[in-house]
Design a protein with these regions (language model features):
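Flexible, acidic glycine-rich loops studded with aromatic residues
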Residues: 53-59, 66-213
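Active-site neighborhood of glycoside hydrolase catalytic domains
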Residues: 1-72, 77-91
Length: 213
């Protein structure tokens, strides 16, 4: 069960009488971040009752009175709320969804700076599942990408494609996704990119026949 924690605009709840009453009743203090943590814990309890696992798209701070359960899987992408290194130190299971180079945003974006979020297959090939980067200069990993040591707590990666027309998905992913898959599933051995991309091109010809392109 997926929760997009980064989309929670907690400022909207600071001066809501009903929210303030609820926080007082449940001894949550005055910090709405504690309300958010309370919500995440409650959701995790509900999800587990249905024999499911909760996936959390980061969004919660490292500091807080209410402890976030360690059986929650955290998808870490922005390196803003809770650094991947801290998530590992704190015992969480993590999926690498690093903005650079795993995002593919190719048109229709209201935020102009995010239009940079399209990286070449070669750039994706230089990434590994223990590495986080970001194109935004306000993030901690902008100048110094975070390369973590190999750990079983990082269980994989995810390529993220959004804010583009449906017919644009296959053209933008067809030569990037195979490279990403190679770096996730075959991270122990690495041939030169030029040699590997020959395989991608051959398989892409087969894809063209399948989809009649």
């Amino acid at each position: 069960f997926h929760i997009g924690g980064d989309e929670a605009n907690l400022d909207l709840y600071k001066n809501v009488p009903e929210i303030n009453s609820f926080m007082k009743k449940n001894n949550l203090g005055k910090d709405v971040n504690e309300l958010f943590r309370y919500f995440l814990v409650r959701m995790n309890e509900i999800v587990k009752k249905h024999n499911k696992k909760m996936f959390l798209w980061e969004g919660f701070r490292r500091e807080g009175e209410i402890e976030i359960p360690r059986d929650v899987v955290v998808f870490a992408f922005e390196t803003m709320y809770h650094l991947p290194s801290h998530l590992i130190e704190d015992g969480f299971t993590v999926v690498n969804t690093s903005w650079t180079p795993l995002y593919l945003v190719n048109g229709g974006v209201k935020q102009p700076r995010a239009r940079r979020a399209v990286w070449s297959p070669q750039t994706i090939y230089s990434w590994n599942v223990w590495r986080w980067e970001h194109w935004w200069d306000q993030t901690p990993v902008y100048k110094n990408p975070m390369q973590l040591e190999e750990t079983s707590q990082i269980i994989g990666g995810q390529m993220c494609s959004w804010e583009q027309a449906g017919e644009a998905e296959i053209p933008s992913l067809r030569k990037r996704l195979p490279v990403f898959i190679e770096r996730v599933w075959n991270n122990k051995e690495k041939m030169p990119f030029e040699d590997f991309f020959v395989r991608v091109e051959k398989n892409d010809l087969k894809l063209s026949k399948i989809i009649n392109d």
